[in-house]
């Protein structure tokens, strides 16, 4: 591919053309100025980037040596002293409160679900942006949230018995969320607006209204009749849709045709763990979809059966408040974008020495200039009404790396003419050195931080790699019961509240990774708002609608107020290493652990390498579909590498397991015409060789990250064959 030289940068022609012809026009930023500033940014900050990565390696070497001499720490005080001596654990400064300004309500004050989607997939991105609202009826009917017992099977057509169960569940939810002064929602026979109040007629003929009349936010009318009532609890809206001729409403005594939930309040458009972006071609796709979202013109032609339609961004909703004043309600999730971390470089742009530029610097500059289509001088202000750009920054290790990200953002703002602190930062608390120094990490970004989030998956991967030499780790399924996990989750909330995030920023919790198990999610994920999290990750718009019910049941602001006075989680618990003290696993248990890890690795890696798919639903050993991305891959690969290193398993056993499970993964993908079987020839299957690398060379991967192997192997495939098209 030809390259264009600009101020010492060698930019692949297609990327250059995209920037000059599509991204920059309309932003007020001229190409010459853009590339001049971009070059300065790269050549001045790339050396700092490399130095920070070298520091990671130096810490790891010191930790490896300590563990080799001492094993798993039994004297946690001595271990903590060692971490302080080497500068891994830093002194904690005085208390402070964050000062982030111009933060949209979706982040500052509204508690609710958050989606994370691969920005390279336009359909997923549009679905996520439009997932601000979802049908509660559809979410219940189409999932296992409603049992199929007693004749309530989903079936091919509409099942009235199942519909009755859905309606009963939804009415019971309304009793909790927007209770009536008298009677139950199941007995409602009619709704009307009278003198600014919701007038409710029960089947008995009695009249009632809302227990709290202020929960009526507004109405929408067509042809003089109210067709929807907008209610509100804990800052979240629920819309009761009336249609006497509707498929459901016609048979409903109150003509309620649907109940629509305000669902995914925010959505992260991901350039990182859920995508496979290894070169200019891939980055252009990511950036062009982000451009379409910021300009509002992204669209995707969707085919469902015989029905073909074009999906676009939903327009805002119009209502009239009880006093007769019109107002607008957002119909799209507030979009954040996750840039990559500090580790990777990308061949799309080379510096003056011919080296690949740090991908995190490239992401910052390009995604920010694209955001000007929304927040710039001539911006639409359809995403951020407060004029802010929201960047989630992953995989940072400690406050020095957070400060470096702040420096990048500051330089980008100066280059693009943005006001200082326009670019807000979400800090992923997913690396051990960030966890133990979280207060100082937040301090480093106190004018920008809008989000801290525990990422159990990556955090576990880092836990394993950090203490690789300490001994064999406990089984992967036992990790959630380990002492460090509960302390880590509570510590994140405690530190966030101590730093004044409540009412200003999100304190988030991690992903529900089983998209088919919605009944279990409804039962369990309420623990996140109860723990003080004002957002948590969900795997689909449907899951967002169901998880939204939890934020009606739990007043997160009240929970956070109560948690501010609790004793902070113990650092010593966080520092405890999850090594199996006296492993007594049977050979069958060991093999099952290997099988499960291998299946997850192969099922994900084969689609990443061969098809460029960065996020997949992969069946586990029990045939439960699990959402897999690079974070889950990191855990599985590091866990296998750890057991191999400590002799729990042999290399021959690992290879045999991977080969046997590859055949099973091949069978599971037999219906995919784009799939390339691995077991046909293990030696020539680049995907299988990548899986081998991730495990057999797992100890030498930087911090246990999977990106170096994945990128190298994906580029190898793209160079030697025409990649499979999805």
Swiss-Prot record:
Alphabetical UniProt keywords: Cytoplasm, Glyoxylate bypass, Magnesium, Metal-binding, Oxidation, Transferase, Tricarboxylic acid cycle
Cellular localisation: Cytoplasm
GO molecular function, one term: magnesium ion binding
SUPFAM superfamilies hit by this protein: Malate synthase G (SSF51645)
GO BP term (any one): glyoxylate catabolic process
EC assignment: 2.3.3.9
Cofactor(s) needed by this chain: Mg(2+)
Catalytic activity: glyoxylate + acetyl-CoA + H2O = (S)-malate + CoA + H(+)
Modified residues (Cysteine sulfenic acid (-SOH)): 615
Binding-site residues, acetyl-CoA: 116, 123-124, 274, 311, 539
Any single Gene Ontology cellular-component annotation: cytosol
Protein's pathway: Carbohydrate metabolism; glyoxylate cycle; (S)-malate from isocitrate: step 2/2
Pfam families, per database record: MS_C, MS_N, MS_TIM-barrel, MSG_insertion
Binding, glyoxylate: 338, 430, 455-458
Gene3D superfamilies from the UniProt entry: Malate synthase, domain 3, Malate synthase, domain III
Function noted in UniProt: Involved in the glycolate utilization. Catalyzes the condensation and subsequent hydrolysis of acetyl-coenzyme A (acetyl-CoA) and glyoxylate to form malate and CoA.
PANTHER family assigned: MALATE SYNTHASE G
Protein name: Malate synthase G
Originating organism: Allorhizobium ampelinum (strain ATCC BAA-846 / DSM 112012 / S4) (Agrobacterium vitis (strain S4))
Highest classification ranks of the organism: Bacteria, Pseudomonadati, Pseudomonadota, Alphaproteobacteria, Hyphomicrobiales
Gene: glcB
């Amino acid at each position: 591919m030809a390259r264009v030289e600009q101020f010492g940068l060698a930019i692949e022609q297609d990327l250059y053309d995209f920037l000059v012809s599509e991204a920059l026009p309309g932003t007020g930023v001229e190409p010459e100025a853009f590339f001049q500033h971009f070059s300065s940014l790269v050549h001045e900050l790339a050396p700092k980037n490399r130095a920070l990565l070298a520091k990671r390696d130096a810490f790891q070497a010191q930790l490896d040596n300590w563990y080799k001499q001492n094993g798993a720490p039994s004297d946690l005080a001595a271990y903590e002293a060692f971490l302080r001596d080497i500068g891994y654990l830093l002194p904690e400064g005085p208390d402070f409160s964050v000062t982030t300004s111009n933060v949209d309500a979706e982040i500052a004050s509204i508690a609710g679900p958050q989606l994370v989607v691969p920005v390279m997939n336009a359909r997923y991105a549009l679905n996520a942006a439009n997932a601000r609202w979802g049908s509660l009826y559809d979410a219940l009917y189409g999932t296992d949230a409603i049992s199929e017992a007693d004749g309530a099977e989903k079936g091919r057509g509409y099942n009235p018995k199942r519909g009755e169960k859905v309606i009963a569940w939804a009415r019971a939810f309304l009793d909790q969320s927007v209770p009536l002064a008298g009677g139950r929602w199941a007995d409602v026979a009619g709704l009307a607006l009278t003198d600014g109040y919701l007038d409710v007629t029960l089947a008995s003929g009695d009249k009632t209204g809302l227990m709290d009349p202020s929960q009526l936010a507004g109405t929408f009318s067509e042809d003089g009749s109210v067709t929807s009532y907008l209610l509100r609890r804990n800052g979240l809206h629920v819309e009761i849709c009336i249609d006497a001729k509707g498929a459901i409403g016609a048979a409903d005594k109150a003509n309620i045709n649907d109940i629509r939930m305000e669902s995914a309040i925010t959505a992260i458009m991901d350039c990182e763990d859920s995508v496979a972006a290894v070169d200019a071609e891939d980055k252009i796709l990511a950036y062009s979809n982000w451009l379409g979202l910021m300009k509002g013109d992204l669209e995707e032609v969707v085919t469902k059966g015989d029905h073909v339609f074009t999906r676009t961004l939903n327009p805002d909703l119009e209502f009239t408040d009880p006093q007769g004043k019109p107002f607008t309600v957002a119909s799209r999730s507030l979009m954040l974008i996750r840039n990559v971390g500090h580790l990777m470089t990308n061949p799309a742009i080379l510096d003056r020495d011919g080296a690949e530029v740090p991908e995190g610097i490239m992401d910052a500059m390009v995604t920010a200039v694209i955001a000007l289509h929304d927040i710039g001088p001539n911006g639409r202000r359809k995403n951020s009404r407060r004029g802010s750009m929201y960047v989630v920054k992953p995989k940072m290790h400690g406050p020095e790396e957070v400060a470096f990200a702040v420096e990048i953002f500051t330089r980008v703002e100066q280059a693009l003419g943005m006001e200082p602190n326009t670019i807000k930062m979400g800090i992923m608390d997913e690396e051990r050195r960030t966890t133990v120094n979280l207060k100082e990490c937040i301090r480093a970004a106190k004018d920008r931080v809008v989000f801290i989030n525990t990422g159990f998956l990556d955090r576990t991967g880092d836990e394993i790699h950090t203490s690789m030499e300490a001994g064999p780790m406990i089984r992967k399924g036992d990790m959630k019961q380990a002492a460090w996990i509960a302390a880590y989750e509570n510590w994140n909330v405690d530190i966030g509240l101590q730093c004044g995030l409540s009412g200003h920023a999100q304190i988030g919790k991690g992903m529900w990774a089983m998209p088919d198990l919605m009944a279990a999610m409804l039962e369990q994920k309420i623990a996140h708002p109860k723990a003080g999290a004002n957002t948590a990750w969900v795997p689909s718009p449907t899951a967002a609608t169901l998880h939204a019910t939890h934020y009606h049941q739990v007043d997160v602001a009240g929970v956070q107020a109560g948690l501010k006075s609790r004793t902070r989680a113990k650092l010593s618990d966080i520092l405890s290493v999850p090594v199996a003290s006296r492993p007594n696993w049977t050979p069958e248990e060991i093999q099952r652990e290997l099988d499960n890890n291998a299946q997850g690795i192969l099922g994900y890696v084969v689609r990443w390498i061969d098809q460029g798919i960065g996020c997949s639903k992969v069946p586990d050993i029990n045939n439960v579909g699990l959402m897999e991305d690079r974070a889950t891959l990191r855990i599985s690969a590091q866990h296998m590498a750890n057991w191999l290193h400590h002799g729990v398993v042999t290399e021959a056993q690992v290879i045999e397991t991977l080969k046997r499970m590859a055949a099973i993964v091949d069978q599971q993908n037999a219906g995919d015409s784009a799939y390339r079987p691995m077991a046909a020839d293990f030696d020539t299957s680049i995907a299988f060789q990548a899986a081998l690398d991730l495990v057999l060379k797992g100890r030498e991967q930087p911090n246990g990250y999977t990106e170096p192997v994945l990128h190298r192997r994906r580029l190898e495939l793209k160079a030697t064959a025409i990649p499979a098209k999805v």
